[in-house]
Curated annotation (Swiss-Prot):
Entry's Gene Ontology molecular function annotations: metal ion binding; stearoyl-[ACP] desaturase activity
Cofactor(s) this protein cannot do without: Fe(2+)
Residues annotated for Fe cation 2 binding in this entry: E192, E245, E280, H283
Record: residues binding Fe cation 1: E154, E192, H195, E280
Top EC category: oxidoreductase
Claim: Cell inner membrane is one of the keywords in the record: no
Pathway listed: Lipid metabolism; fatty acid metabolism
Known partners and oligomeric status: Homodimer.
Protein name: Acyl-[acyl-carrier-protein] desaturase 6, chloroplastic
Free-text cofactor note: Binds 2 Fe(2+) ions per subunit.
Keyword annotations: Chloroplast, Fatty acid biosynthesis, Fatty acid metabolism, Iron, Lipid biosynthesis, Lipid metabolism, Metal-binding, Oxidoreductase, Plastid, Transit peptide
Family: Belongs to the fatty acid desaturase type 2 family.
C-alpha cells in the first residue's frame, strides 16, 4: 500500500472515513518509491465535521515527520564519528583490500581473450575472426540482448567511479590521492575498465550487433548518471557496491555457462564472460570485506545501512538504460534476463542469502539498538519473503494467462524477441 495511504488510515478509521473509489490520486516518487498521494477528494467522511482536506493535511504531516526522521538518520552517517570509522580503517585497507588488485603485468587484457593481429599475423587474424563469427551465429537473440545489457552496464564505469569519489572519507579528492582508499578506487576502476572493452570488442568482431545503436545506449546511460540514495554515505555505498559486484559476477557467470560448450558452443564468448565474472568475484570479495569490517566496528549503524538498502531493493545501475524509443526498456531487459537465465529473481535472493551469511548478520547482538535488532531480523528474514513473493507472482501470472509480446530491439538490427512483461 502507498506510504501516505498507510499513514492516513488510522486517522481515517477514527473519523469513520473511507476511501472515495470514484476519485483518483496522482503518484510521485517519495523516499525512492512510487507513492499514491491523497487528494482532498480521496476520502468521504460520514458523521464527522472533519473534511477530506483535514485528513490530507494529517497525512502530509506524517509524511513530513518520516522525511525529517530519515534525513536525520542519513546525516548521522556523515557525522565526524562515523567518518572517523572509515579513516581508522585505512591501515586495514592497505593490508586486506589493496592486495586483491593484480599487478598490471599479471592482469589479463582484452587482446589476450580475442583474436590479436600482433600475435596471429594478418591471415591468422582474419581466419580467427571468421571462426569467431561462425560460433557467434549460433547464439540466440535473447542472449544477445542480455549481453548488450551486461556490456552497457560495464561501459558506464565513469558513473561508478565518480559516485565512489563522492563518498565521504574515502573519495579520491585530488584525482591522485595517496590514501589507501583512493588507490583502491583507481585500481578497481582500472581493472573494471577492461570489462566493457573486451565485451565491446567481441560484439564488434561477431557482426551480430548494430554497434552504432549499442554505442548510443552507452552514451545515453553515462549522460543520464545514477542517483545514489543516500548520497555520500560510505556505509550505504559499500553495501550497494558489494551487492552489485556479486550480481554482475552472477550475470556474467550465467552467460558464460549458457553460451559455452554445454550451451550454444561459443567458446570465445564463454571465455570472455567467465574471465569478467572471475574479476567481479575478486572485487566482490573486497567490498564484502569492507562491509564486514564496518559491521565489526559499528554493528548498529552497519546493519541498519544493510537493511535500508535491501528494503528499497538493490536496482541494477542500468535502470536508466534507453534505446531512444521505448520508455519501458529496462523492464523489458529485466524480463528478458529472467527468461534467458542470465540474472533472475532467484539469483537476487541467493545474493541476499549469501551476503547475510558472509556478514554473519544473524549473529549480531552486542551493541545493537532496538532499531538495529529490527534491521537485523528484517535482513535475515528477507530471503524467505522474496521466495514467497516470487511464488505469488508466478501464481498471479498463471491466473492472468498473459501472453508474451514480440518487440523489435534496435541493438540487434530490429530483430524481434518475445518478452513476458509483468
Amino acid at each position: 500500500m502507498a506510504a501516505t495511504a498507510t499513514m492516513a488510515m488510522p486517522l481515517a478509521n477514527r473519523l469513520r472515513c473511507k476511501p472515495n473509489t470514484n476519485s483518483s490520486s496522482p503518484s510521485r516518487t517519495l523516499f525512492g518509491r512510487r507513492v499514491t498521494m491523497i487528494s482532498s477528494s480521496r476520502w468521504m467522511c460520514r458523521g464527522s465535521a472533519v473534511s477530506g482536506s483535514a485528513i490530507m493535511s494529517a497525512a502530509a504531516d506524517d509524511v513530513a515527520a518520516v522525511r525529517r526522521e530519515e534525513d536525520e538518520e542519513m546525516r548521522s552517517y556523515l557525522s565526524p564519528e562515523k567518518l572517523e570509522v572509515l579513516t581508522q580503517m585505512e591501515p586495514w585497507v592497505e593490508e586486506h583490500v589493496l592486495p586483491l588488485l593484480k599487478p598490471v603485468e599479471a592482469a589479463w587484457q582484452p587482446s589476450d581473450l580475442l583474436p590479436d593481429p600482433a600475435v596471429l599475423g594478418g591471415e591468422g587474424f582474419h581466419a580467427a575472426c571468421a571462426e569467431l563469427r561462425e560460433r557467434a551465429a549460433g547464439v540466440p537473440d535473447l542472449l544477445l540482448v542480455c549481453l548488450v545489457a551486461n556490456m552497457v552496464t560495464e561501459e558506464a564505469l565513469p558513473t561508478y567511479q565518480s559516485s565512489l569519489n563522492r563518498v565521504r572519507a574515502v573519495g579520491d579528492l585530488t584525482g591522485a590521492d595517496a590514501t589507501a582508499w583512493a588507490r583502491w578506487i583507481r585500481g578497481w576502476s582500472a581493472e573494471e575498465n577492461r570489462h566493457g572493452d573486451v565485451l565491446n570488442r567481441y560484439m564488434y568482431l561477431s557482426g551480430r550487433f548494430d554497434m552504432a545503436e549499442v554505442e548510443r545506449a552507452v552514451h545515453r546511460l553515462i549522460r543520464s548518471g545514477m542517483a545514489v540514495d543516500p548520497p555520500c554515505s560510505p556505509y550505504h555505498a559499500f553495501v550497494y557496491t558489494a551487492f552489485q559486484e556479486r550480481a554482475t559476477a552472477v550475470a556474467h557467470g550465467n552467460t558464460a555457462r549458457l553460451v559455452g560448450a554445454r550451451g550454444h558452443g561459443d567458446a570465445a564468448l564463454a571465455r570472455v564472460c567467465g574471465t569478467v565474472a572471475a574479476d567481479e568475484k575478486r572485487h566482490e570479495a573486497a567490498y564484502t570485506r569492507i562491509v564486514s569490517r564496518l559491521l565489526e566496528a559499528d554493528p548498529d549503524a552497519g546493519v541498519r545501512a544493510v537493511a535500508r538498502m535491501l528494503r528499497r531493493g538493490v536496482a541494477m545501475p542500468t535502470s536508466p538504460i534507453s534505446d531512444g524509443r521505448r520508455d519501458d526498456l529496462y523492464a523489458c531487459v529485466v524480463s528478458l534476463a529472467e527468461q534467458a537465465g542470465t540474472y533472475t529473481v532467484s539469483d537476487y535472493c541467493s545474493i541476499v542469502e549469501h551476503l547475510v551469511w558472509e556478514w554473519r548478520v544473524e549473529e549480531l547482538a552486542a551493541g545493537l539498538s532496538g532499531e538495529g535488532r529490527r534491521a537485523r531480523d528484517y535482513v535475515c528474514e528477507l530471503p524467505q519473503k522474496i521466495r514467497r513473493m516470487k511464488e505469488k507472482a508466478h501464481e498471479r501470472a498463471v491466473k492472468a494467462q498473459k501472453k508474451p509480446i514480440s518487440i523489435p530491439i534496435n541493438w540487434i538490427f530490429d530483430r524481434h524477441v518475445s518478452v513476458m512483461l509483468p
